[in-house]
Structures are given as C-alpha cells and as structure tokens.
C-alpha cells in the first residue's frame, strides 16, 4: 500500500475508463491528479489517516424500466479503490492458482459471458436441465461483517482490512447532498466492488459444489443410446442408393445431430455442472 508504482499503475488503469472524467463526490476529475496527490495519499496510508468520502449517488435507467443505483466516488478514492482491487486480484485471482472456482466467470481477468458460454458448449454435453437464478441487489445486500470475516481467511494484514472497512462504511450522498450511512453492500460504481462481491459469492459457489458432489453419481454414462447407430445405418443405406438429396436423408442427418450418443435417462448416472 506504500509503493508509488502501484498507485501509478492504478492511475494508468482507470484514467481513460468511460465515465472517469465525471466529477466525483469531491468535485474533482482524474486529470487533476498529480504526483503530489499520490505522495499525499501514500503518507495518509502510512499513518492510517486516509478516509473515503461518501459516494455521490446517481440513478441509471435499466432495461426493465427500473433504476440502478450507482455511486460515484471521489477522485482520490477511485485510485485507492483500484489499488485495493489490484492487491485483492493478486491474492484471489493469481495465475499461479486462483482462489475462485474455475466455473466462475464474472468480474475476473480474461473471463466474461463469452468464456462461460464456451465452457458450456465444450464441457456440458447432453444437458437436460438448466437452473437459472438471480441474486437480487447483490452488491447492495452484502453484509459488511460477513465479508470482512471472509477476507480474513486469506488476509492477515489488519491495516489492509481496516482500509476495506473504511471503504464499506464511507456512506453516500443522496440527490439532495444529504449524507447517509452505509449499513450494507459495496458501492456500485466502485473499482473494488466487483472483486469484493466475488469474495462473498464464492461461498455460494462452494455450497453449490458441495451439493454437486453429494448428488452426482456414476463417473460416466454406461448405457449407450441405440438410436444414433440405427440412424447411421439408415443414412449409409440412403448414401449407397444415391438418395442424399431427399427429404428422408436430410431428416435422418438432422436426427443424428440432435440425439445424444448416450442414454440421458440412465438411472445410474447423475451429472451436475
């Protein structure tokens, strides 16, 4: 937390991000940051005097007609939050051995909805059911005490944890500029919030994995589906007859592509992803 290079890296990472020229809760913008500002922040870190200002609240329209709360932090807080994110990423998402589950794709380096879809396509053959869920107001509902206790599983530096406490408890300004306490949640719009949410949601992944192991049985499906073989034989007969342009041939090919090679209703096999 005291190395100048880390703060310079944080500044370079966020200075050109969309929306970062929007004035923060202190009225300043990223182009007002200087080396003197960074030196002041580092000194305040050493003496534990750095304080996060309340975030400025704005409301962003959602596709369903509702509005999402977005907190705009002060310019100095943006840099410190990015430093926190960089450090947490090194702890929880190191290339040498990430803490998060391999199946977790949200708010992680080199991962996205596209990588999640590629994994489903490549590793989840013959899936019968998908369970869709949504964590309502995920960022807003995170319990501060529970989150910090989870962080303590990996982090022993109480100064760093105290800085995260300050971030969580910074409060917010409403549209009338009145200050309110932050009793729960991580500020949406904050650079550190996504990875803090991942630390919390990781416990859900752990529980899901526990359930998967408990209910899954049978390493591989043992019963092969006889229908694809019959259809393949029918296809070969049509090829030998030269009837590859017929409706019957197209139907057979389509059925071969759509029918799984193994028996999906095998009672001795339950596969869960």
Each PLM stretch: what is its role?
Residues 1-273:
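Non-catalytic terminal/accessory segments
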């Amino acid at each position: 937390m005291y190395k100048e290079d880390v703060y310079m890296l944080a500044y370079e990472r966020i200075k050109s991000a969309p929306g970062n020229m929007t004035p923060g809760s202190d009225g300043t913008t990223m182009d007002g940051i200087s080396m003197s500002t960074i030196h002041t922040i580092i000194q305040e870190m050493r003496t534990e005097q750095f304080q996060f200002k309340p975030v400025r609240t704005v409301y962003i329209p959602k596709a369903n007609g509702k509005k999402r709360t977005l907190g705009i932090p002060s310019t100095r807080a943006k840099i410190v939050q990015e430093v926190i994110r960089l450090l947490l990423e090194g702890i929880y998402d190191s290339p040498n051995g990430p803490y998060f589950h391999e199946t977790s794709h949200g708010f992680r380096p080199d991962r996205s909805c596209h990588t999640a879809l590629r994994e489903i396509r490549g590793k989840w053959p013959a899936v019968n059911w998908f369970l869709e869920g949504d964590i309502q107001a995920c960022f807003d509902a995170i319990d501060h005490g529970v989150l910090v206790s989870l962080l303590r599983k990996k982090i022993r530096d109480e100064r760093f944890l105290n800085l995260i406490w300050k971030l969580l408890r910074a409060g917010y300004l409403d549209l009338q500029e009145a200050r309110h306490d932050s009793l729960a949640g991580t500020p949406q719009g904050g650079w550190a919030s996504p990875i803090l949410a991942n630390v919390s949601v990781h416990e859900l992944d752990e529980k899901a994995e526990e359930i998967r192991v408990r209910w899954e049985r049978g390493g591989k499906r043992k019963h092969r589906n006889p229908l694809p073989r019959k259809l393949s034989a029918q296809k070969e007969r049509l090829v030998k007859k030269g009837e590859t342009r017929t409706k019957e041939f197209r139907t057979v090919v389509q059925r071969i592509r759509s029918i799984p090679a193994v028996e999906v209703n095998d009672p001795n096999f339950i596969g869960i992803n």
